Amino acid sequence: MSNTQITSQAEKLALIRESERMTRKQVAELTGINYNTYAGYEQGKVKMSFDAGMKFFKPERFRKYRDWFMFDETYPAGGQIAPALAHIGQDSTTLHHSDQKTG
């Protein structure tokens, strides 16, 4: 299992939706969560309840993100991944300076 580090629930919801190339309206329709309620979750105005989380992860399309969303963990062999747009591991990458001249 690998760890990932996205902190806010709102940011995670947006990354999942954007990685699936969906609109907020499409997510609301797929999950059965009221559009305005879902938009509030994604905008960070209110935290998603456990019941809403169950609705969100019920569609098979979103199940692959469940461990990442809840525990900041992925397990690709078990089908648990992070969204493509999450840019996992960026802050742990070090760029080394090169003394080579270009041009």
Please describe what each predicted stretch is.
Residues 17, 28, 57:
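The alpha-helix within a helix-turn-helix
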Residues 1-20, 102-103:
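A short, Lys/Arg-rich alpha-helix, primarily the initiator
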Residues 13, 27, 38-41:
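Conserved hydrophobic/aromatic packing and binding residues within compact polymer-binding modules
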Residues 32-48, 52:
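Recognition helix of helix-turn-helix/homeodomain-like DNA-binding domains
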Residues 22-25, 49-50:
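Short, charged amphipathic recognition helices of the HTH superfamily
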Residues 2, 67-103:
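Short, charged recognition helix plus adjacent turn
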Residues 50-68:
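DNA major-groove recognition helix of helix-turn-helix/homeodomain DNA-binding modules
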Residues 30-33, 59-61:
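A short, basic/aromatic helix-end/turn motif that makes direct DNA contacts
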